[in-house]
């Protein structure tokens, strides 16, 4: 009898077929179970200790999963979903993980019945198309210029977060920041929150004293103590070049034969710095901000001309100042012209917050960049407020691009679930089971909302199903009490973009993991 032939390395860990699929499903369910309690206004907080030793307190799905270390490839894939959701729409990170985990859990008994994964994927894709059209039917348009409607929408996003107590303030901050950085070029709207809406966190004070500055704030002080620290309507010059003696680009050797040569070298250095300052003084600015250094001699010449200087600012800060006050960033002082001077700023002043000095450029006429100043009792709380505010700004930005609202409180998910269950009856053969499984799985969102506020899920879901069967698609769960309420009256709305992206991402990731029938864990070769 022939001995067995080993083609694959026997040291590696390998799972094949049904075992591999069940392993993926178990991993996905485990990740979903971690953040299941983080959904809704009664969400629990997670306390995480990161490798550096600092504590993270949050109920934001993406922030939690980012800190968790997992070994299973399917679990890593699930965590990637939360990142995608956060980058695309900014909200719904917890929902998408719970949905994906539940859809895969619903696929588990179907695999046990020996239904082929390809048949299931076909039904899942059909269910996805139908779900997207159902969401489109029950959405309402929103007027992005109406502050009351926008506030109601953003309040829903942050109602489940730590900052729910200060929801009016956060709505105001998020909406004002998004409106400030919105710009239209070539007939196309651009809202770049990441680049032009900077969040500056200063521990101390009260959360209520947080505000949006119509300009820019920097953690900088003037370079010379006698320079002016308050200037009204300043003329601003932005530079990307040093105000110091330009040394040789590479190593330079100079041979000195007389002592006068040495003095002449020093004079040349001074002349060069003076020439640089003369170029600046010629356009009569009040404030010079450079990304590079400013020498003591340059400070002296600028001080004599009554010009204030700031040095070593970040490139991103310089870009935001340029957007806020209308200045152009100059790379060579020889090219500095009157048109490069920014005159859009109303007030420049330096103020002390806590132990640090900060530069404020405020009162800008038409700022296309802003700074959000966050205050709070501790670093941990301010970090969580910042995460919540980023979500709120992302939601506001999405509504500007996609001005449609879906009812919140699990109403949209229940409407999709009930309508898909009705459609499942008209499907013949084995394909009906996976289709029905998606319908049942999407119901997990309202069920989790009820469970998280300690109410009876069976009673609440039966009542909610009955309302939706009658065609009342705006009924959902009040996340505070677990009662069934009409979202039109209750006023909980979410952007359609968040709902569409959640269901798309969840079903597509479930399809991806179901197609996997072989997991090979490679083992590194041990050095001899």
From Swiss-Prot:
Disulfide bonds join 364-370. GO terms for molecular function: ATP binding; ATP hydrolysis activity; ATP-dependent protein folding chaperone; unfolded protein binding. It holds the Pfam family Cpn60_TCP1. It comes from the Eukaryota. Keywords: ATP-binding, Chaperone, Cytoplasm, Disulfide bond, Nucleotide-binding, Phosphoprotein. CDD domains: TCP1_gamma (cd03337). Gene3D superfamilies: GroEL (3.50.7.10), GroEL-like equatorial domain (1.10.560.10), TCP-1-like chaperonin intermediate domain (3.30.260.10). InterPro entries: Chap_CCT_gamma (IPR012719), Chaperone_TCP-1 (IPR017998), Chaperonin_TCP-1_CS (IPR002194), Cpn60/GroEL/TCP-1 (IPR002423), GroEL-like_apical_dom_sf (IPR027409), GROEL-like_equatorial_sf (IPR027413), TCP-1-like_intermed_sf (IPR027410), TCP-1_chaperonin (IPR053374). It is found in: Cytoplasm. PROSITE patterns: TCP1_1 (PS00750), TCP1_2 (PS00751), TCP1_3 (PS00995). One of its GO terms (cellular component) is nucleus. The keyword Disulfide bond applies. The keyword ATP-binding applies. One of its GO terms (biological process) is protein folding. The modification Phosphoserine is found at residue 250. PANTHER family: CHAPERONIN (PTHR11353). Molecular chaperone; assists the folding of proteins upon ATP hydrolysis. Known to play a role, in vitro, in the folding of actin and tubulin. Heterooligomeric complex of about 850 to 900 kDa that forms two stacked rings, 12 to 16 nm in diameter. Belongs to the TCP-1 chaperonin family. This is T-complex protein 1 subunit gamma. It comes from Schizosaccharomyces pombe (strain 972 / ATCC 24843). The gene is cct3.
